[in-house]
């Protein structure tokens, strides 16, 4: 579960390395965000010579959480870290590569570009 002030790893090559969640998009008073939710985040750590800079406010979609994800067939998926992919206003990823596995639920939420770039979809 991701809430305000949660630090996340970045799962793409956009130039950001660590994010901090500021807000969850789509509702006024929701406390937690899960896989597939869009958040507003600030960059806490960035790679040198990257187009994204530290303290820049961006949008990101959550692709991995430490909290379990229960599917309808009874399968439970849990990842080792909290990770997000930086996106633009249209929902397209800013990076050209995705690192690590992502959940199949992103395809149902119309993040097909992220799913196609991912090396493994669970």
From Swiss-Prot:
GO terms for cellular component: chloroplast; large ribosomal subunit. Binds to 23S rRNA. One of its GO terms (biological process) is translation. Belongs to the universal ribosomal protein uL14 family. Signal peptide: none annotated. This is Large ribosomal subunit protein uL14c. Disulfide bonds: none annotated. The gene is rpl14. Its main location: plastid. It comes from the Eukaryota. The keyword Oxidoreductase does not apply. Transmembrane segments: none annotated. Part of the 50S ribosomal subunit. The lineage of its organism: Eukaryota, Viridiplantae, Streptophyta, Embryophyta, Tracheophyta. It is found in: Plastid, Chloroplast. Keywords: Chloroplast, Plastid, Ribonucleoprotein, Ribosomal protein, RNA-binding, rRNA-binding. GO terms for molecular function: rRNA binding; structural constituent of ribosome. InterPro entries: Ribosomal_uL14, Ribosomal_uL14_bac-type, Ribosomal_uL14_CS, Ribosomal_uL14_sf. The keyword Cell wall biogenesis/degradation does not apply.
């Amino acid at each position: 579960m991701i809430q305000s002030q949660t630090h996340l790893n970045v799962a793409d090559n956009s130039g950001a390395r660590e994010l901090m969640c500021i807000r969850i998009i789509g509702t006024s008073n929701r406390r937690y965000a899960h896989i597939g939710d869009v958040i507003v985040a600030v960059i806490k750590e960035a790679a040198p010579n990257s187009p994204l800079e530290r303290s820049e406010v961006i949008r990101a979609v959550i692709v991995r959480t430490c909290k379990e994800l229960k599917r309808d067939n009874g399968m439970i998926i849990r990842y080792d870290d909290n990770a997000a992919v930086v996106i633009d206003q249209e929902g397209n990823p800013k990076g050209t590569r995705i690192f690590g596995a992502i959940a199949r639920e992103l395809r149902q939420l119309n993040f097909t570009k992220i799913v196609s770039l991912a090396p493994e979809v669970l």
